[in-house]
């Protein structure tokens, strides 16, 4: 059976994602590694249950568990790299609180398809170790400190004094750590959505709901928004306008090029990134490579082509000379560093990077394959002068429709027509 999606194992808790599934995953990983497995989680109420099941699975296989508590996914990735070990992050990232997920990390990196398939096969056949070899559970109190120290050393010359930031931590895994780190660098921080109760993670907040903190953006403040597990980051500029992942990539690509960090003068983006970003980068002698949607595909291309910077419009951005995965805090610090070095406001920098109007619709369906119908294909063929992408979500029962072009009204009409067509054929299948 296929358990892994585009970003680990993810689903509604106690429907698809059960304690038994978590136990089987833990047992499979525990049998594959020597020694220890690090575990961290976000703030969802189901995290404790899934953590307990994972621990039982891992220790029954004879491996030790190092429990890191609540911390962002990129922090766990760093720990596994420093410790040359495996890790499992309990999080569904930007998804609603009824979802959770299990992301397996090996020595800093997410798994390739071949290793996921091997784990899935192992999950079918639970293997217990003898009683004298049952693993232990260690509360790893140094995890947060290790990550903090790593960030402090990376950006030891960064001074954010005088910068006023409203920080939306999405009631998620960054609620405690990330504001402290930005304050360390001198920024004045106002934190919102930082009272996690297990049920409010990502709920009308965080990087998927930037409009909800616009009222806080006054008197020269800028906004920083994370998702539930802290691997994404977007900004609001001083005018309350979204400074999304495409803008961040454009701004920081120029900064990395000046610093001699942009290997091969190339950047990796996905098919969802705006044509305006590509033209801006090309005008600055930077080539653009496009991949399928998903940070794993971005990372694969970066490693294959020896590229330092890659990411998604959603704010999932990888600085490979800084981290092995998308890191919302590093993305924030790279963006703030570029802003400080430019001597300009974020709003002024935003105007330099063009952004063609985009319309994105999420069409709920019972069958995600419906988008492949002949009628939808013919409709897409008939559209001229607009970029259209129709694709199924890897984590939710929806088909995503993206239309991009010179006129917002026309893009909206096209997107709605396609969405209606998908709904029509989905209803016929029910």
UniProtKB/Swiss-Prot annotation:
<dbReference type="GO" id="GO:0005975">
    <property type="term" value="P:carbohydrate metabolic process"/>
</dbReference>
<dbReference type="InterPro" id="IPR005845">
    <property type="entry name" value="A-D-PHexomutase_a/b/a-II"/>
</dbReference>
<dbReference type="GO" id="GO:0009252">
    <property type="term" value="P:peptidoglycan biosynthetic process"/>
</dbReference>
<dbReference type="InterPro" id="IPR006352">
    <property type="entry name" value="GlmM_bact"/>
</dbReference>
<feature type="binding site">
    <location>
        <position position="229"/>
    </location>
    <ligand>
        <name>Mg(2+)</name>
    </ligand>
</feature>
<dbReference type="InterPro" id="IPR005841">
    <property type="entry name" value="Alpha-D-phosphohexomutase_SF"/>
</dbReference>
<dbReference type="GO" id="GO:0004615">
    <property type="term" value="F:phosphomannomutase activity"/>
</dbReference>
<dbReference type="Pfam" id="PF02878">
    <property type="entry name" value="PGM_PMM_I"/>
</dbReference>
<comment type="similarity">
    <text>Belongs to the phosphohexose mutase family.</text>
</comment>
<dbReference type="InterPro" id="IPR016055">
    <property type="entry name" value="A-D-PHexomutase_a/b/a-I/II/III"/>
</dbReference>
<dbReference type="InterPro" id="IPR005846">
    <property type="entry name" value="A-D-PHexomutase_a/b/a-III"/>
</dbReference>
<comment type="function">
    <text>Catalyzes the conversion of glucosamine-6-phosphate to glucosamine-1-phosphate.</text>
</comment>
<dbReference type="GO" id="GO:0000287">
    <property type="term" value="F:magnesium ion binding"/>
</dbReference>
<feature type="binding site" description="via phosphate group">
    <location>
        <position position="93"/>
    </location>
    <ligand>
        <name>Mg(2+)</name>
    </ligand>
</feature>
<dbReference type="InterPro" id="IPR050060">
    <property type="entry name" value="Phosphoglucosamine_mutase"/>
</dbReference>
<dbReference type="GO" id="GO:0005829">
    <property type="term" value="C:cytosol"/>
</dbReference>
<feature type="modified residue" description="Phosphoserine">
    <location>
        <position position="93"/>
    </location>
</feature>
<dbReference type="InterPro" id="IPR005843">
    <property type="entry name" value="A-D-PHexomutase_C"/>
</dbReference>
<feature type="active site" description="Phosphoserine intermediate">
    <location>
        <position position="93"/>
    </location>
</feature>
<keyword id="KW-0413">Isomerase</keyword>
<dbReference type="Pfam" id="PF00408">
    <property type="entry name" value="PGM_PMM_IV"/>
</dbReference>
<dbReference type="GO" id="GO:0008966">
    <property type="term" value="F:phosphoglucosamine mutase activity"/>
</dbReference>
<keyword id="KW-0597">Phosphoprotein</keyword>
<dbReference type="Pfam" id="PF02879">
    <property type="entry name" value="PGM_PMM_II"/>
</dbReference>
<dbReference type="InterPro" id="IPR016066">
    <property type="entry name" value="A-D-PHexomutase_CS"/>
</dbReference>
<feature type="binding site">
    <location>
        <position position="231"/>
    </location>
    <ligand>
        <name>Mg(2+)</name>
    </ligand>
</feature>
<feature type="binding site">
    <location>
        <position position="227"/>
    </location>
    <ligand>
        <name>Mg(2+)</name>
    </ligand>
</feature>
<dbReference type="InterPro" id="IPR005844">
    <property type="entry name" value="A-D-PHexomutase_a/b/a-I"/>
</dbReference>
<keyword id="KW-0460">Magnesium</keyword>
<dbReference type="InterPro" id="IPR036900">
    <property type="entry name" value="A-D-PHexomutase_C_sf"/>
</dbReference>
<dbReference type="Pfam" id="PF02880">
    <property type="entry name" value="PGM_PMM_III"/>
</dbReference>
<dbReference type="GO" id="GO:0006048">
    <property type="term" value="P:UDP-N-acetylglucosamine biosynthetic process"/>
</dbReference>
<protein>
    <recommendedName>
        <fullName>Phosphoglucosamine mutase</fullName>
        <ecNumber>5.4.2.10</ecNumber>
    </recommendedName>
</protein>
<keyword id="KW-0479">Metal-binding</keyword>
